[in-house]
Each structure stands twice: as structure tokens, then as C-alpha cells.
Amino acid sequence: METAAGSERRSTPGPAVPPPPRGHAPLATASGPLSSPAREPPQPEEERQLRISESGQFSDGLEDRGLLESSTRLKPHEAQNYRKKALWVSWFSIIVTLALAVAAFTVSVMRYSASAFGFAFDAILDVLSSAIVLWRYSNAAAVHSAHREYIACVILGVIFLLSSVCIVVKAIHDLSTKLLPEVDDFLFSVSILSGILCSILAVLKFMLGKVLTSRALITDGFNSLVGGVMGFSILLSAEVFKHNSAVWYLDGSIGVLIGLTIFAYGVKLLIDMVPRVRQTRHYEMFE
């Protein structure tokens, strides 16, 4: 009995505090800076910006190691498969655009067309740019080489500048002398054929460039796209001149516009790629 009474005396200190309900955290006694993160979860916009920042840092890290982003996207056999496709498209582009360049030069000389001359120069540029892409992907071990990629882009930028100067000078000369283009079936045939073929080549190069994350292939595709636009512009200016001889300046004006577009793209390409060539010059092991 004394033991029971003693246990009763020990268990009488005051009412017991009920435990917190299950599933609920204990209430904080005082609000402070430590409790603010729990009440303010990160916003979706902040999470998206964080992911973008991490992706950019990851790409920069790849470039610092001399690799393109395609090295993490493609398996080795997939990369080699797309490399071979890029080579085939480049060879096909060289053959087609070389034939179109000869035809366009013929039209330019015989029909006094500034747009035809501009297209012929752009076709020669397309041949050279496709040859550079061939060099870019000629080495199977350098399919992901950032240094090789940037060198190809710098060469393309220089070619763009030289070609644009020739196109603009020829177009301005034709405008100043008021040369009137002659219209015939041969001019129509060349313009339609060049417009269709160059547009198809541009789509193929853009697709391969996106998969291989290749700025050189995308630049080559841009050049083919310009060739397609110039081909259709020959058709447009000739058709307009046929119905209204007062609009004789349309042909030369299109030539000037396309020349300036190529010049701007070339300058942008050099500004972007020259520093990157210097940054990756230590990775010539891929050559």
C-alpha cells in the first residue's frame, strides 16, 4: 500500500499536455527568419530561371572542354550516322549549286540581271560553305569538336563578307547605269529550279544542324535559304518588269538587300566565333 501511495504521489504533478495531432507539425513559439522559407515556396518562374541558368552553365562547361552540346545528346553511333548524312547533303549541295551558279552567271551576262548575278555569287558561296562543312565532318573523331566547329564558322564569316561586297557593288552599278533586265523562258527556268532546290537543301541543313548542334551547318543552311530567296526574286522582278517597265529598279534593289543581309550575318558570325576559337585553341587534339 505504501508503494502504491508513493507512486500516486509521484504521478500527481499537474495535467499532462496532450501530444500534437498526428500529421501536423508543432507550432512555432515565435516567428523568425528561420520560418520564412517554409511559408514561401519557390515560385515556378524562379525554378524555370534556375533551370535555364544551370543549362547555360552546363553548355559553357562543355565548351570549356572543347565539346559541343551534341556530345551529351547523341550516342556514338547516332553521331556518326548524322555525320555521314551531313557529308552526303554537303556533296549533293556542291553539285547542285555549282550547276546553278554556272546557269545563273550565264543569265546575268546575257540578260543583265543583278539578281541573277547575286544568286550566282551566292551559289559559289554555297559551294564553298558546303566544302567547309565537308572539312568540318571529314574527321570522324572530331564530330563533337568545338574548336573545329568554330574555325569553320570563322571561315564562313569571311566568305560571307567578301561575297556580300561583290553582290552589293554589282547591284549598285546596275542601278546607277539603269540596266533593264530582259525576260525569257531561260530566266524563268533557272529561277524556279534554283528556288526549289536551294529551299530543299536549306531545310535539310537546318535539320541536321539542329541535331548536331552545328552552327556551321546552320550557317550553310542559311546560305542555301538565301539562294532560294534569290532564285524566286529573279522570277518576281522579271515578272514585275514584264508588266510594268517603270519598276526596272526592283531587280537591283533586291540584290542590294540580299547583299547587306549576307554582310550582317557574316559580321555577326565573326563576332560570335572569333573569341570562341581562341578559347578552344588548346583542344586541337580533335584534329
From Swiss-Prot:
Leader sequence residues: none
GO molecular function: zinc ion binding
Domain of life per record: Eukaryota
Keyword presence, Repeat: no
Residues in the Cytoplasmic compartment per record: 1-86, 136-148, 207-215, 275-287
Topology of the protein relative to the lipid bilayer: Multi-pass membrane protein
Extracellular side: 108-114, 170-185, 237-253
Region (Disordered): 1-63
Positions where Phosphoserine occurs in the chain: S11, S53, S55, S59
Compartment(s) where it occurs, according to its Swiss-Prot or TrEMBL record: Cytoplasmic vesicle, Secretory vesicle, Synaptic vesicle membrane; Early endosome membrane; Late endosome membrane; Lysosome membrane
SUPFAM superfamilies in alphabetical order: Cation efflux protein transmembrane domain-like (SSF161111)
Gene Ontology BP term (one): zinc export across plasma membrane
Reaction(s) catalysed (UniProt annotation): Zn(2+)(in) = Zn(2+)(out)
GO cellular component, one term: early endosome membrane
Residue ranges crossing the lipid bilayer per the database entry: 87-107, 115-135, 149-169, 186-206, 216-236, 254-274
Residue span of region Required for interaction with MCOLN1: 40-70
Gene3D superfamilies: Cation efflux protein transmembrane domain (1.20.1510.10)
Record keywords: Cell membrane, Cytoplasmic vesicle, Endosome, Lysosome, Membrane, Phosphoprotein, Synapse, Transmembrane, Transmembrane helix, Transport, Zinc
Role of this protein: Zinc ion transporter that mediates zinc efflux and plays a crucial role in intracellular zinc homeostasis. Binds the divalent cations Zn(2+), Ni(2+), and to a minor extent Cu(2+). Is a functional modulator of P2X purinoceptors, including P2RX1, P2RX3, P2RX4 and P2RX7. Plays a role in central nervous system development and is required for myelination, and survival and proliferation of oligodendrocytes.
Family designation: Belongs to the TMEM163 family.
Subunit structure: Homodimer. Interacts with MCOLN1/TRPML1. Interacts with SLC30A1, SLC30A2, SLC30A3 and SLC30A4.
Record-given protein name: Transmembrane protein 163
Source lineage: Eukaryota, Metazoa, Chordata, Craniata, Vertebrata
